[in-house]
Amino acid sequence: MIVDNSGDGRIAGWLQGRAAERLRSIRLDPPLGFAAAVNAGIDAAAGQVVILFDSGVDLTGDAVSPLVNVLSDPSVVVAGPYGLRGQGTPKEFAASRGPEVDAIEGYCMAFRRADAQALEGFDPRFQFYRIADIEFSFRLRDRGGRAVVVPNLPLEKHEHRLWEATDPKERQRLSKRNMYRFLDRWGNRPDLLVGLQGARRAHF
């Protein structure tokens, strides 16, 4: 399934010309914010597992089966190839190979559709994409599950197209707003940081 949130009639025509039984597309007209667009895809999905592939990712093989297999473990609530861990605080995150992490980046992100619907999907206040994936990962994990990195998937990651298409000052403003929104809810929840959990176990 492809969610067309571009507002570009040429893309809509291209997708319509490639419509097939195994390819469905949803056109959002007028375009919505990032989170609302993702939620439209989640609502329209038919499978038990939803895997988000950002337009900045190219598949070079079967990246689906390994992600579905990982989610057969009921303790795993979100998985993907690109993980993040808080650097001692929810205010700063860095890439991590895991295997257990604090959040999965939205470039490629797999989760159960039922879990997403129980949370009412991504927070629609995140109209810009930055931090929305981290916030969604935290809400999934807050229900008692784990975020897990699945390495070596056949993917090629490119620059994020929306990031490149947005004016630098504007993307900085939108990113800061999303981070403040995230911290309003999760800034006082260091218990969700995997690294700090490990430090506490080692200490005691």
What kind of region is each of these model predictions?
Residues 28-45:
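Glycine-rich, basic loop-to-helix element that forms the pyrophosphate-binding segment
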Residues 50:
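Short aromatic/hydrophobic "clamp" motif used to bind/position activated sugar donors
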Residues 77-81, 85-88, 97-99, 110, ...:
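C-terminal, non-catalytic tails of nucleotide-sugar-dependent glycosyltransferases
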Residues 11, 38, 61-64:
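Acidic donor-diphosphate engagement hotspot in glycosyltransferases and nucleotidyltransferases
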Residues 58-93:
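Conserved donor NDP-sugar-binding/catalytic core segment of glycosyltransferases
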Residues 35, 92-114, 129:
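A recurrent flexible, glycine/aromatic-enriched loop bordering the glycosyltransferase active site
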Residues 1-27:
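Acidic donor-binding segment of Leloir-type glycosyltransferases
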Residues 66-67, 106-120, 125-154:
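A short, conserved alpha-helix in the catalytic core of glycosyltransferases
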